[in-house]
């Protein structure tokens, strides 16, 4: 039901209850639910069951009095067609034709912003996601983070937040050193398996590509940084490191472009060291008495804040453990005014949550407990040609986001092993990401089609199917099908705002029409719930249900009939459905094609 209807009906019930309560007794909270069975109406409320015992009244009798008050109220007469008492005292309400017509009118009036709310009035929120090490291509786990994080950020924007998308580059530490020595080994002519190949080196073909470009003196640049030119000197490990990191950051930028994700800021872990923020954080924790030394190491008293044991901050060799810069990084988030922060990360980060939060609490700078929030996702398995894919030639040990986008795009060149995204970039093809819309849409939708905390199997063969089995095709086809109906009808949707909607909202309409209107009405509340619960998968679930309701209605009620009033009413319902499909797809970054 529309949020405005929900508010009115809740107030209506509250007023009805208030009229029956003894003077001075507080009114209970009114909770509205959707009945499990459509035959029981549109709204259910158990307030009579709650109040019967305190009032010493039979719950059915009390429910009957509440129902009489609703029927006598002008608000109830407009929005409620029937009030029924069920079981021991449940109050079931059926919405009126006017209430259903309001849904379609609201979609027409609000258009591309139907479902949006200004609940949070511009309150800032930072969503950190992807945050990959610049040591290799983005893998499918990063892809799941990109889909989840970008959709979540969009959801929060739709609820009135001022959203900041941030990517944290782990460009410090031993993994970056391993990257540099890997490229150096390739530049010297070694390859995996050779006696001189470093033990901790990366083996993917991309390492050879970086080495070749470094030796060729090519220039690379990340989207937010200065250009770096290969110095050709195989002995200069720092120059190799700088070139390799920038090269891979640029590669990740390309993958994110193909995926349709834009960040407001890329934050470098290395800057926390160069700007002294890590040392400042450690010094502050020491000064606060939150640390102690043991066996040459510096420990943080994380057990004070719920961790199962204290944690090492600085090892005996002087190196900081990985959660220390994380604590420093989060102090910058708080210092920049982000009182709400959400980190989207793999489930392997679960163990760091208590440590980061304990470190932030130890600083005693006003950060609330439970800061930041986390959305953790489980792993993704990739299936192709009926078998699990474990190794990518490009990456060496895992399937990349680029692999998924190219495979799901259905290009013959990609099937033949050509890096088509790289080819488009090198050819300077204008607006090249548009060429990969099909693959991007499939990857985004699929990676949102399960809850984040469940493991997911990405079936490339299914992503390429043009059938109802393919969830993104099923939803997009609903949108395209409606566009086709309007093309055949030769009717401008804007002309339907004044249509008589009785044929789709009246008492004698098909159950399919009623179900479709109910689904449209649920869109704003679904978005609000998904944002509050940090659950972007709910949008994908809703879109599949909406597409199903549309297809059921379309198959049950012929739209282009001779009766002009009926035709216009059904076209108006289709126009509203198309708008909500488009809005929902926009929230999760998936296109709404007019033809398929």
Curated annotation (Swiss-Prot):
Annotated gene: argS
Cellular component GO terms, alphabetical: cytoplasm
Family membership noted in the UniProt record: Belongs to the class-I aminoacyl-tRNA synthetase family.
Family annotation (Pfam families): Arg_tRNA_synt_N, DALR_1, tRNA-synt_1d
GO molecular function annotation: arginine-tRNA ligase activity; ATP binding
Catalyzed reaction equations: tRNA(Arg) + L-arginine + ATP = L-arginyl-tRNA(Arg) + AMP + diphosphate
Main location: cytoplasm
A GO BP entry: arginyl-tRNA aminoacylation
Subcellular location: Cytoplasm
Disulfide bonds: none
Oligomer status and interactors: Monomer.
Nucleotidyltransferase found in the keyword field: no
Domain of life from the UniProt record: Bacteria
EC number: 6.1.1.19
Organism, as annotated: Ralstonia pickettii (strain 12J)
Protein name listed in UniProt: Arginine--tRNA ligase
Locus of motif 'HIGH' region: 132-142
Keywords: Aminoacyl-tRNA synthetase, ATP-binding, Cytoplasm, Ligase, Nucleotide-binding, Protein biosynthesis
